[in-house]
């Protein structure tokens, strides 16, 4: 059944003369009145390298949409660079910005009655924020990301932002060497080149089905990234007419992002050792979609999904550009499908089922198309470059080696255990998360005395000041969604542990979270958090912490009676919290619920 255009409320009828006059002043031509209005939700900013190159692409998408008969209007959201906001109180604002982005998209699209959206996202909180908005609005939506940064290179070795952070804190590394690394770590526009949060989310968007193949892996500088934007423009027009003209609801976000799609996305995440932040975001997006997807599902999947792809920071051998050469996300999904670990019947924005998309785009498929070969041969140029789609370097050959290549088959998996795991115990009754792909197997079982800090800043000072020694478990409390507030990322503490050459000799646990750039025995999202009365807030220096990844447990060596009788450790830090952050803290839920706001 044909659907009424949402935009008709502001473009049709005598009483909308004023609104039509305003649309005309926005550039709408008379022949465009009554045609679908498609919002281009951009996120250009000169604060974030993952977004610095998006200033003109929105207008290219607009032109492509209007060639096909619709009207398009662009607006921007905010975007925070977690790397620049890291290590100081700026990180308090990162996670809350996800909800601000979701709200701002909802406000703009509903206020102006747009009929559909193209979401141009890229970095850490922008993609999940826009996805949350898409689920709320449930209008035809296509996502296309700005693409990953090329990996840096020094002395024939790849490097990235995390190398700069670790080496700068290592006193054995000279200032000259640090300067060389700093100048080569981030050579192009795009989101940071490892399987950090931004790239993880852009890859998961392919698995959910709201982005086209190549979205997560084609580098930002390549001409095929520009083609992806053109393809997204064509797709949103097609889907808009499918819904409003033909009444086809299969193109709507909630029809695509079903429970099965979230299970597929999480299976991919576990198989590629993605950022632990993805757990937080997928739970929040599923909450907005009203899809039945919970922490227990993640625990279940983590026990049966192997690790098929390892990328920085879990190894320095591969970066996202190498995943692209190996066939991208469809290459990993193809292996998961062969093992029966994903549901290939789910639908996608391109009208195909996941199974059909894998058949067409998996480079090991006998039916792989030429378009796929071209996408996945898109290479890094190896030059400093801040311009989107400005180079056309191609690999001569694809990486189809599923035994020893970047992407493995089930028989040659990096590990039978997946790249993420959910642990539970008397420290984390509602669960916590560890990226096992980044943990050396020699410390999957770890027991040690607690060194407790009530802030990230105190932990950094303690680590750099020599208070943390081999065998310790660093415990950072009161950094959860409510307690921070804002659930800061603990990338600096984990980087400083590595800089002190303790990466395989210490653990770190927190009710805060971690950057996708974190590796090592780093356990976050401990729920309930200290600010909600969680037992992590009762741990004292010297308490023995027991971590067992194979058994999925984390405990402090105290009886239930001892824990119940012990008071919360008082918070000694001084931290100024603004009214906006206090408002966030008053509404936010725990990490095991996705840190969504609880609003009646």
UniProtKB/Swiss-Prot annotation:
PROSITE patterns: ILVD_EDD_1 (PS00886), ILVD_EDD_2 (PS00887). Mg(2+) binds at residues 82, 124-125, 489. GO terms for biological process: isoleucine biosynthetic process; L-valine biosynthetic process. Its EC number is 4.2.1.9. GO terms for molecular function: 2 iron, 2 sulfur cluster binding; dihydroxy-acid dehydratase activity; magnesium ion binding. Pathway: Amino-acid biosynthesis; L-isoleucine biosynthesis; L-isoleucine from 2-oxobutanoate: step 3/4; Amino-acid biosynthesis; L-valine biosynthesis; L-valine from pyruvate: step 3/4. The active site is at residue 515. This is Dihydroxy-acid dehydratase.
């Amino acid at each position: 059944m044909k659907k009424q255009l949402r935009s008709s409320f502001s473009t049709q009828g005598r009483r909308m003369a004023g609104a039509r006059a305003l649309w005309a002043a926005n550039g709408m031509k008379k022949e465009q009145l009554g045609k679908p209005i498609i919002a281009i939700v951009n996120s250009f900013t000169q604060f974030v390298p993952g977004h610095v190159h998006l200033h003109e692409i929105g207008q290219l998408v607009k032109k492509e949409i209007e060639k096909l008969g619709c009207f398009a209007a662009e607006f921007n959201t905010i975007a925070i660079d977690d790397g620049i906001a890291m290590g100081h109180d700026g990180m308090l604002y990162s996670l809350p910005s996800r909800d601000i982005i979701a709200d701002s998209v909802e406000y703009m699209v509903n206020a102006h009655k747009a009929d559909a959206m193209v979401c141009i996202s890229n970095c850490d909180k922008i993609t999940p924020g826009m996805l949350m908005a898409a689920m709320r609005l449930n209008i035809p939506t296509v996502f296309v990301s700005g693409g990953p940064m090329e990996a840096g290179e020094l002395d024939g070795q790849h490097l990235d932002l995390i190398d700069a952070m670790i080496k700068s804190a290592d006193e054995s590394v000279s200032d000259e060497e640090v300067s060389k690394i700093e100048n080569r770590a981030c050579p192009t526009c795009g989101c940071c080149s490892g399987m950090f949060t931004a790239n993880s989310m852009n890859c998961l968007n392919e698995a959910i089905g709201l982005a086209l193949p190549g979205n997560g892996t084609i580098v930002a500088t390549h001409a095929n990234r520009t083609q992806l934007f053109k393809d997204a423009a064509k797709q949103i027009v097609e889907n808009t007419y499918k819904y409003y003209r033909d009444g086809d609801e299969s193109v709507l976000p909630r029809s695509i992002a079903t429970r099965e799609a979230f299970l597929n996305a999480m299976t991919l995440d576990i198989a590629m050792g993605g950022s632990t932040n993805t757990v937080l975001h997928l739970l929040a997006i599923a909450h907005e979609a009203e899809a039945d997807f919970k922490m227990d599902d993640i625990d279940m999947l983590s026990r049966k999904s192997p690790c098929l792809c390892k990328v920085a920071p879990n190894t320095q051998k591969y970066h996202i550009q190498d995943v692209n050469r190996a066939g991208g996300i469809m290459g990993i999904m193809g292996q998961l499908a062969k093992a029966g670990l994903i549901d290939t019947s789910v639908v996608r924005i391109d009208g195909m089922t996941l199974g059909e998309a894998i058949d067409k785009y998996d480079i090991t498929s006998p039916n792989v198309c030429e378009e796929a070969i071209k996408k996945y041969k898109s290479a890094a140029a190896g030059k400093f470059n801040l311009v989107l789609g400005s180079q056309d370097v191609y690999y001569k050959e694809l990486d189809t080696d599923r035994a020893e290549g970047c992407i493995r088959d089930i028989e040659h998996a990096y590990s039978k255990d997946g790249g993420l795991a959910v642990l539970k115990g008397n420290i984390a009754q509602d669960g916590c998360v560890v990226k096992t792909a980044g943990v050396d197997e020699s410390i999957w079982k770890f027991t040690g005395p607690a060194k407790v800090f009530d802030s990230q800043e105190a932990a950094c000072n303690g680590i750099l000041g020599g208070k943390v020694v081999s065998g310790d478990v660093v415990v950072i409390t009161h950094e959860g969604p409510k307690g921070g507030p804002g659930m800061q990322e603990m990338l600096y503490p984990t980087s400083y542990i590595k800089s002190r050459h303790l990466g395989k000799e210490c653990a770190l646990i927190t009710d805060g979270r971690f950057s996708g750039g974190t590796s090592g025995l780093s356990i976050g999202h401990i729920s309930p958090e200290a600010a909600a009365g969680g037992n992590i807030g009762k741990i004292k220096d010297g308490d023995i912490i027991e971590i067992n990844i194979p058994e999925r447990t984390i405990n402090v060596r105290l009886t239930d009676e001892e824990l119940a009788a012990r008071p919360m450790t008082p918070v000694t830090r001084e931290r100024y919290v603004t009214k906006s952050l206090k408002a966030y803290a008053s509404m936010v839920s725990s990490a095991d619920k996705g840190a969504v706001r609880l609003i009646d």
